[in-house]
Amino acid sequence: MVHPFLFLEFLRKMLAPLHLSEASADAVSYTWLIIALLLLLSFLATRALKTVPGGLQNFMEIIVGGIENMVTETMGEHGRPYFPLVATIGIFVLVSNLIGLIPGFFPPTANINTTAACAIVVFLSTHVVGIKRHGIGYIKHFCGPILWLTPIMFFIEVIGHLSRPVSLTLRLFGNMNGHELVLIIFFGLAPFLVPLPMMLMGVLVSFIQAFVFMLLTMIYIQGSLEEAH
C-alpha cells in the first residue's frame, strides 16, 4: 500500500521510463535508500575502530554480535561462514520493515517483489551450499531412506523445497502489507495519537518478521549441510 505522500516522490518520476507500477517504483526507491543508509552506517561505524567501542561502533557491534551468536547457537560453529548472508538479509529486512513506520515512507517489504527477491536469494543459497558441501550426493536429500519410495519421495521433497520461497515471500509480504493497510485506515479514521499503539505493535511485528526470516534462512541452510539419511 502506497502512502499518500512519499519522501522519495521525485524518484518515482525518475523511474518512469522503466514503466514500473507506482508501488514497484516506490519499493525500488526505498530499497536503494535503505542500501545507501546501511552502507553509510557501516562506513561511519568502521572508519575509526577502537579497542573499547563507543557510540555507533558499540551499537553496531551489539547488533552484529547478537546475530553471530544466534547463528552459532542455531547452526553450530560450522555455520559461521554463512553469518554474512544471514546478517545481511536479517538487517535489510528489519530496516525495510521499520522504515515504513516513519510517516511518508514506504516499507519495501510491503511489496511482494522485494520479499520474493529475498526469498529467492535464500532458496538459491540453500541449494548452492548443499551442492558445494555434498556434490552430486546432494540429490540424496530428495530421495528418502527407502529405495522403492524414491520416485514418490523425490516429488514430495521437490514440492516441499519449492514451497519454501513461496512461504517466505507471502509471510513477510502479508504481514507488512496488512500492517500498512491497518495504519492507513486508522490514520484516516482517527486523530493522530489514536493509531500510536498500532505503530508500537508495528515495531514488534517488524522485529518478529525479521527474526523469523533469519531463523528460517538458518534452518534451510543447516538442512542442506546435513548428511542425507
From Swiss-Prot:
The chain crosses the membrane at residues 25-45, 86-106, 111-131, 142-162, 181-201, 202-222. It is found in: Cell inner membrane. InterPro entries: ATP_syn_F0_a_bact/chloroplast, ATP_synth_F0_asu, ATP_synth_F0_asu_AS, F0_ATP_A_sf. Its main location: membrane. Keywords: ATP synthesis, Cell inner membrane, Cell membrane, CF(0), Hydrogen ion transport, Ion transport, Membrane, Transmembrane, Transmembrane helix, Transport. Coiled coil: none annotated. F-type ATPases have 2 components, CF(1) - the catalytic core - and CF(0) - the membrane proton channel. CF(1) has five subunits: alpha(3), beta(3), gamma(1), delta(1), epsilon(1). CF(0) has three main subunits: a(1), b(2) and c(9-12). The alpha and beta chains form an alternating ring which encloses part of the gamma chain. CF(1) is attached to CF(0) by a central stalk formed by the gamma and epsilon chains, while a peripheral stalk is formed by the delta and b chains. Belongs to the ATPase A chain family. This is ATP synthase subunit a 3. It comes from Pelobacter propionicus (strain DSM 2379 / NBRC 103807 / OttBd1). The lineage of its organism: Bacteria, Pseudomonadati, Thermodesulfobacteriota, Desulfuromonadia, Desulfuromonadales.
